[in-house]
Each structure stands twice: as structure tokens, then as C-alpha cells.
Amino acid sequence: SGKSKYIPVTREYLEANHIQGASDTLSILYNQFPQLGLFDGKNMIIGGSIEKLANYPGILSGDISALLIHNMPWYARQAFTPTVDIATAPEWEYKLRETIKQVLQEPIVMFGGVPTWLIVLFRSILEKTGKANLLEIWPRLRLYIHGGVNFAPIKPIFKDLIPSDQFIYQEVYNASE
């Protein structure tokens, strides 16, 4: 409908559906591509925003991507960048600026997030570094996990940002319903 939906999401729901789905996706990818090496570097995920509700202590409100990042298992957090606070920050300019600072210090091998947000982030990174493409910054970049939008019209932009026939684009359906 285009309008924000507020759906109660329990930890059990997140673990049984989204977190298990992420684990299944990585298992399938490693089975198909044993050389993937996703834990040889950092996994960058840019999520939506999250906020604490003043009238409801202990209750968080946010995009499903932000809730997933906030509830990420400890073992996945070890390979995750930027920090949870930055990845789920509500103010876009702050999130962009601080993400760039963090990810330029990391060996990124995989990324996830909304394609249009990532295009803005990646173009800002290229502008800041003066590099021609992302592989000049992160030579071991291997995988983009995406979903939620039609990727076909956007894929050529990513092909320019990551000029490699070996790069893997993995679509997932990560719905909140």
C-alpha cells in the first residue's frame, strides 16, 4: 500500500523466520560456491531505522531490516559492519557519513541493503576515495544479497560499480508479513 505498517514482531518470530532464513541462504550459497569466503572479511549491511518508543519502555519500532540487524546473533555480529547503532540510525546523512568512515577501514566481502541506498553510499565512497569502482577498494568483494524491489533495472548500475563476472547477486524475499 506504500504506507508504513506496524506489525508486532517477537524475538521468536525473528529467529524462526528471518534469522533462520539468513542462515539457510548462506548455507545454500556456500554449497553452491565453496570458495565464497564470506567470513574472510566483513559483511556490510545498511538497514532502515529503529527507535525506542517513549511511551513503551523496552519496545522498539522500525523497519524489519533494522530489527534484524538489532537482533543479529552474536556469531554474525563478528563479521558485520558498520556498528548496529550506525546501521540503524534514523538520520540518513549521519548514517551515510559514519558508515563511510567505518567501511573504508574494513575488508568488505559481502553487502546487503536497499539497492537505491547502496548506490548513494557507493557513489559517495568512490567520490571520497577517487577510485573507479568498488573492487579497487575491496578486491575480495564477492556477494550482494538483495530483495524487496525489482532489481533488473538497477543491476546495470551495480555492474558498473562492481565490474566482475564472478560477483554474485543473490535475491531473497525478506517480507515482514
Name every feature range the model reports, one short phrase each.
Residues 1-177:
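Active-site phosphate/ATP/adenylate-binding loop shared across adenylate-forming ligases
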